[in-house]
């Protein structure tokens, strides 16, 4: 059961990263337009998966801030 739980979380965040990648590459100068949708997704994951605030902060850094920073750097220097 724990393996299925972890793989489901991994799948959700892989799909989320793909969506972030697509949106940020399509509109590289306006990622803040989609910030509300990302925040709702973070809230959804927090409620459904029942993560702790520390885990949620790590998830926020790894799957939101770092990809957005990477894509911003990529769009600026590409």
Swiss-Prot record:
Which superkingdom does the taxonomy of this entry point to? Viruses
The protein's UniProt keywords, in alphabetical order, are: Early protein
The protein here is known as Probable protein E5
**Recorded family membership:** Belongs to the papillomaviridae E5 protein family.
Q: Tell me one Pfam family matched here.
A: Papilloma_E5
Alphabetized InterPro entries for the sequence: Papilloma_E5_alpha
């Amino acid at each position: 059961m724990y393996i299925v739980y972890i793989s489901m979380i991994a799948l959700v965040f892989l799909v989320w990263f793909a969506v972030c990648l697509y949106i940020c590459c399509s509109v590289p100068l306006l990622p803040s337009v989609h910030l509300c949708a990302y925040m709702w997704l973070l809230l959804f994951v927090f409620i459904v998966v029942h993560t702790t605030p520390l885990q949620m902060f790590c998830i926020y850094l790894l799957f939101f801030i770092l990809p957005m920073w990477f894509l911003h750097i990529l769009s600026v220097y590409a």
